[in-house]
């Protein structure tokens, strides 16, 4: 169980670094919407909703809600 959590955290950190590098392109590509920051990109990629901060992005990624 711990290994799964660690793997998830690693994946999220890699996505966050990609977001910082590509300016939200990854989130836009996967979520189908424009993203300009790390939180928005992450939320758009997994939750498919607009997010403008890291907390919102995480919420969109996990629950698909604000």
UniProtKB/Swiss-Prot annotation:
Keywords: Amidation, Cleavage on pair of basic residues, Repeat, Secreted, Signal, Toxin. Residues 21-66 are annotated as: 3 X 16 AA tandem repeats of [FI]-G-G-G-L-G-G-A-V-G-G-R-R-R-R-D. Residues 33-37, 49-53 form a propeptide. Expressed by the venom secretory cell of the spine. The spine is a cuticular structure containing a single large nucleated venom-secreting cell at its base. It is an independent unit capable of producing, storing and injecting venom. On the back of D.vulnerans caterpillars, spines are grouped together by 50 to 100 to form scoli, of which there are eight in D.vulnerans. The keyword Secreted applies. The modification Glycine amide is found at residues 31, 47. Residues 1-20 form the signal peptide. Sequence repeats lie at residues 22-37, 38-53, 54-64. Its main location: secreted. It is found in: Secreted. The keyword Repeat applies. One of its GO terms (cellular component) is extracellular region. GO terms for molecular function: toxin activity. Probable toxin. Belongs to the limacoditoxin-59 family. This is U-limacoditoxin(59)-Dv128. It comes from Doratifera vulnerans (Mottled cup moth).
